[in-house]
Amino acid sequence: MGDYTAEFTPDEQALIDAEFARLSDSTYLDHAGTTLYAHNQVSDAAQQLQRDVICNPHTCRVTGDYVDQVRYKILEFFNTNADEYHVVFTANASAALRLVADHFDFGTNGNFHYCQENHTSVLGMRQLVSANRIYMLTKDQILLNNGTPAGATAAAATAHSDNSLVVFSAQCNFSGYKMPLTVIEKIQQDGLREPGKCIDCKLQSDPGQSNYYVCLDAASYAASSPLDLRRHRPDYVCLSFYKIFGYPTGVGALLVSKRGAELLKKRFYGGGTVNFAYPHTMEHQLRSTFHERFEDGTLPFLSIVELLQGFQTLQRLVPGRSMERISRHVHSLARYCEQQLLQMQYPNGAPLVTLYNHAGYEDRMQQGGIVAFNVRTAAGDYVGFGEIASVAALHRILLRTGCFCNVGACQHFMNLNGDAMDAIYKLAGRICGDYYDLLDGRPTGAVRVSFGYMTRLQDVDRLLQMLRDSYLSVKWHQRLDFIEQRVQQLPKLLQQRAQQLRPQLLQLAIYPVKSCAALKMPASALTDQGLQYDREWMIVDLNGMALTQKRCTDLCLIQPRIVADQLQLHFNGDGSTTFVSVPLSLTDQATNSARCQSKVCRQSVEGYDCGDEVANWLCQQLGLDGLRLLRQSAQRRAPGDRQQLSLVNQAQFLLVNRASVRSLGFEEPLDETVDRFRSNIVIDTGVPFEELEFGQLRIGEVLFQVEGPCQRCDMICINQRTGQRSPDTLTTIARIQSGKMRFGIYISRLPNENRMQPQLACGDPITVLR
């Protein structure tokens, strides 16, 4: 099927399935987080605990023998022996990295180099290392060393007094990219061709020559790939065994080469690490055996002993070069998943996903069993990973979202510069592990699926079907209805995020003076005629006809502001700071002022003349004579007597969908294009022109009826910030809408039993009812 090649025989697959029968009604796709333990693996471990007396190894030599047996098993698993490597047990790979950071001897002028696409724990090493310079390397800068012949650089393999440490992951836990391990020897022999970007340089002088040591974070790699330490010999290897076996947790290891052991200088000592230590003087003597010097206190001996069942389980379920076969299996699944995802498209041809990887999925030596991606809408907008996590949870699919404790890979693949990172973490307040998934439409993380030896092809197919059913086959409001109806089934961390998934009211604008600039507001009260103060005033000419941008484009440069109880009008065209004000309240004086009549869309309207001061100001700014400002004085009803209107053309509210605006593809900033359509309400459904199918919708607590599409004229060709015309706006809409000049929808408010004065506010959720 596709490019999937089965690795296991039918009998082997049946045995594996029987061990993981508990997965019958769920799909587990987070093996990069941890793989799963087999049924008999934990049963055998429990039987051993019930059968044997396993006590503190400082008390019982039998326990010490068990622990040593596990050490030999670990060395055998990585194709090495005790003559080449020491095994130091730690709590996990992070603790192993810390051990190196704490004790590595940089000399007086050594450097610390780390790869950008690394686990957070590697970044944490920066706080402990005693190096005078700390550098960040990109993946490509590390790869530069792979083409360097031995002895080609200035740092070639003669001994130096200073020592530099280079840390990188054998496999990126974000993307699954595998670093070519041949680079290890090149760096050890020749140093680095490029030092990277200096992140913290206490000394500005030339770093000079140095011996180079490599610390390999193998936590992700070793879980599903064979690591041959006879072929590739890093100085330090960091491991977490739960990622390989699923059980037990709380035990990892630092493998230290004989070369690397010389550079780890122990300072602190705990129980079991010394031959003696005097309380009355500073004198002490560390144990001569390397691992005994570094394993402070009592080991987690029960967990260590239970690793034996892990090794046995792998050999029993995946016999014959277990890790080689697991590597082929997970890579085949990942390649199949990637190819199927790439084939998924919306009816308009837009891809469903954006994938994140460096080398594609053709070569197993470069790519592991991880697929990272983000889902996109038909308009190309990103779907937040929090939504994907919610949909997956309701389909009983366990996957991972976010940055996966690899913010450097996140930064690289999301193309986030320093300012964007500050906006996400400092200004917006995101923290690692939350569901803050989009910032101004850009993803702050991704969706990750990863595979283990017990993952089946149908598990991948279930993920793919979920994406088809939830994104290619239904509209967004149907999907969100599905989530909201089942929100209590979600984990608590996702329940709040799920309630925020609905599209929100993004922008709220009123146009106090008809055909003048918008006044954008965070919230607005609603009246019987629409938004408060929306189109209550209009400018008329000598003949009493309403002045619009069709006749005078400079109207868009008159910027209204509401300050206290005044409506201020500012002119943005000449850089002046002068303005004119009219009162917001209808005082007796205003009520007794001259009444005038005009027309809006062939309907007569009555208004109060706002006086000579504002009239003279308008004439001066617009360069026209005889202008007057009128304020609507009487109720006006739409045709059919259904709704009260202000001085709007046709309905109480005009709604525009940013997804539809985005589909026009104009080169100007999107916000400028949105402003051309002079809407009251801006939303973003992610699907262009979907709003034309709405019947009723709720915004916050307010119910609206759709009156129909807005038929456009050439006024939308005017840039509302400059007053310049660009006729391609109208022709583009006509082309996309098959000759129809429709863009945006008119809506009117339906009666509401709530007697409180309703209002709309940015952030209100949007619910499509029919």
Curated annotation (Swiss-Prot):
What keywords does the record list, in alphabetical order?
Molybdenum cofactor biosynthesis, Phosphoprotein, Pyridoxal phosphate, Transferase
Name the Gene Ontology biological process terms.
Mo-molybdopterin cofactor biosynthetic process; molybdopterin cofactor metabolic process
Q: Pathway membership of this protein?
A: Cofactor biosynthesis; molybdopterin biosynthesis
Give the modified residues of type Phosphoserine: S726
Q: Which domain of life is it from?
A: Eukaryota
Matches recorded under SUPFAM superfamilies: MOSC N-terminal domain-like, PK beta-barrel domain-like, PLP-dependent transferases
Chloroplast recorded as keyword = no
Matching Pfam families, A to Z? Answer: Aminotran_5 (PF00266), MOSC (PF03473), MOSC_N (PF03476)
Q: Where is the active site?
A: C405
- Any idea which GO molecular function terms this record carries? lyase activity; molybdenum cofactor sulfurtransferase activity; molybdenum ion binding; pyridoxal phosphate binding
Residues where N6-(pyridoxal phosphate)lysine occurs? K243
> Which EC numbers does the record give?
2.8.1.9
Q: Indicate the enzyme's highest-level EC class.
A: transferase
Q: Which reaction does it catalyse?
A: Mo-molybdopterin + L-cysteine + AH2 = thio-Mo-molybdopterin + L-alanine + A + H2O
The protein's required cofactors: pyridoxal 5'-phosphate
Sum up the protein's function in the record's words. Answer: Sulfurates the molybdenum cofactor. Sulfation of molybdenum is essential for xanthine dehydrogenase (XDH) and aldehyde oxidase (ADO) enzymes in which molybdenum cofactor is liganded by 1 oxygen and 1 sulfur atom in active form.
* This protein's name: Molybdenum cofactor sulfurase
In its UniProt entry, the species of origin is given as Drosophila grimshawi
Q: Which gene encodes it?
A: mal
